[in-house]
């Protein structure tokens, strides 16, 4: 199925996302340009650092006592006084943008038609520019670890390529020899900001710590540009392409990220040198690259399918916006929309989560803002779970690996959070996580900030995957995560009039009214009780399956 869209897409939200799990881009079409909003899944502000929470076991105990008396107003205020002094997590940042601007002498582009081929993970575009019919393909290859933008034209056109970004600092350009002016390489390098010391409640243009106190990771990107039928000249860090009938732009990023608990590389030139040295070895055969990309993608995409109405072949064009605007009684409208959304959901996860990448975050892998909504972090009170619900039912076992890895990395900070904040053993993770695996509460109201069940709920995803794949080696790999999450949950249980339950408790981002006052902290909540009940059921199931548990683990269940 190929989703098609008529007209330009000047807004990021209207663009076409694509990615290979590690890198991603959104392709937007302006009146005279294509813009690639580029992302690398490891580009975050900050670095590993020690941090403590204002929330303590003593404060939680006071709130528990108040809530047990039915004094939910006091319980909320006790927790609120601490959570409003918390810090927020770090921010997922954009790499920058690559702009391919077409000459305006021929006028604006006309008859623009855009497409997303869900069966091949291929973004497409066609338009008329003067006398030229122009076609664009764009994809991001996992096998070659390259993002590709390919333009072909029926007549010579002029275009320019430029790269910009808030955190980019320097550019290096090398062009072909005088006898070969059809190739150029552009290497950009930048520096992520240091710690975000601001908060979502009070967003400013400069929430960063002073650079004298700390800077973030370095990063670099290499662009290889080749043209057909014309030449490239360099003017002020812009690659001018004159009289070309073909243009091939390839991109690879490299960040200074070394691991969630390791200080990153902060020297831009080290990364630029390392990345620049790889360009000569990049593959040159675009057709072979595309074939490898499609074959790699389809080994995931072809595992399942849904048919609710008439069959759609891979090349069938579905005018998506037109169908959305059509009347409800249009034949097969709902069937087509449902099939498209099923395929699009799988496409997004295949494109944003691969083995050994970072997990798919709040916006997958795509972000164009320096201060994205909710920092585009890992929101564990619903969003990251939703991203991965499909791995089992859609036979995408490999794609859950980043979520498993992240939860393994969260165990140490989760142990610290459980002990220092809640006075419990095991591992507790609050609702916002970043690449540095921050497990502490976020800044703000208890309705979101006081919810230490992020890892416990992610365990549902991890165990659900086992129920589909029945792989005992996989189950053994997630056992320590489930075990330590369960230890925390068991320690946090209290006797209530309805039996054992986590107390005090919230239900994520939910309020209730007592005596005319809107509050968030109750003695118990069905949300947290259900998560604990489910985790303990899953733990017992896992323990009955795994043959080699040690005595301590056997005693737990």
Model-derived segments and spans:
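Aromatic-residue-lined binding/catalytic grooves and analogous aromatic/hydrophobic interfacial grooves
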Residues: 1-446, 453, 464-466, 483, ...
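Extended, hydrophobic alpha-helical segments in both membrane/secreted and soluble proteins
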Residues: 383, 451-465, 474-491
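Buried hydrophobic packing segments
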Residues: 390-391, 459-465, 535-539
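Acidic/histidine-rich catalytic neighborhood
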Residues: 484, 488-542
């Amino acid at each position: 199925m190929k989703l098609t869209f008529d007209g330009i897409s000047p807004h990021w939200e209207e663009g076409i996302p694509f990615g290979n799990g590690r890198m991603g881009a959104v392709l937007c079409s302006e009146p005279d340009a294509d813009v690639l909003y580029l992302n690398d899944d490891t580009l975050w502000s900050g670095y590993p650092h020690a941090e403590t929470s204002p929330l303590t076991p003593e404060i939680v105990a006071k709130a528990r006592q108040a809530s047990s008396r039915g004094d939910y107003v006091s319980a909320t205020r006790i927790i609120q006084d601490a959570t409003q002094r918390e810090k927020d997590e770090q921010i997922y940042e954009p790499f920058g943008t690559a702009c391919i601007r077409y000459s305006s002498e021929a006028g604006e582009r006309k008859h623009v038609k855009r497409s997303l081929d869900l069966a091949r993970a291929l973004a497409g575009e066609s338009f008329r520019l003067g006398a030229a019919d122009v076609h664009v393909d764009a994809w991001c290859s996992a096998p070659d670890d390259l993002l590709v933008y390919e333009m072909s034209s029926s007549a010579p056109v002029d275009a320019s390529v430029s790269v910009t970004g808030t955190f980019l600092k320097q550019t290096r350009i090398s062009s072909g020899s005088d006898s070969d002016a059809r190739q150029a390489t552009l290497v950009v390098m930048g520096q992520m900001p240091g710690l975000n010391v601001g908060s979502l409640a009070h967003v400013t243009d400069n929430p960063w710590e002073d650079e004298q106190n700390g800077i973030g990771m370095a990063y670099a990107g290499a662009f290889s540009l080749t043209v057909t039928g014309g030449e490239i000249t360099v003017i002020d860090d812009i690659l001018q392409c004159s009289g070309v009938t073909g243009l091939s732009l390839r991109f690879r990023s490299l960040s200074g990220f070394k691991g969630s608990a390791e200080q990153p590389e902060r020297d831009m030139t080290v990364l630029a040198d390392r990345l620049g040295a790889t360009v000569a070895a990049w593959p040159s055969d675009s057709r072979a690259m595309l074939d490898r990309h499609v074959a790699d993608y389809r080994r995931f995409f072809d595992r399942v399918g849904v048919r609710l109405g008439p069959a759609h072949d891979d090349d069938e064009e579905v005018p998506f916006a037109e169908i959305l605007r059509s009347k409800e009684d249009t034949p097969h409208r709902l069937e087509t929309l449902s099939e498209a959304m099923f395929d699009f959901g799988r496409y997004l996860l295949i494109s944003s989560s691969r083995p050994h990448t970072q997990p798919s975050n709040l916006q997958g892998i795509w972000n164009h803002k320096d201060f994205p909504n909710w920092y585009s972090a890992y929101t564990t009170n619903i969003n990251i779970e939703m991203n991965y619900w499909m791995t089992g039912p859609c036979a995408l076992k490999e794609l859950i690996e980043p979520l498993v890895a992240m939860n393994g990395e969260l165990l140490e900070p989760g142990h610290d959070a459980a002990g220092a904040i809640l006075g419990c053993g095991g591992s507790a993770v609050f609702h916002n996580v970043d690449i540095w695996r921050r497990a502490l509460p976020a800044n703000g109201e208890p309705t979101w900030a006081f919810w230490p069940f992020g890892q416990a709920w992610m365990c549902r995803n991890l165990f659900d995957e086992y129920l589909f794949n029945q792989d005992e080696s996989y189950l053994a790999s997630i056992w320590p995560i489930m075990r330590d999450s369960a230890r925390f949950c068991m320690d946090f249980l209290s006797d209530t009039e309805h039996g054992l339950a986590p107390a005090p408790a919230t239900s994520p981002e939910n309020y209730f009214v007592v005596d005319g006052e809107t509050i968030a902290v109750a003695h118990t909540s069905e949300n947290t009780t259900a998560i604990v009940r489910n985790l303990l059921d899953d733990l017992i199931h896992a323990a009955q399956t795994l043959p080699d548990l040690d005595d301590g683990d056997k005693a737990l269940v």
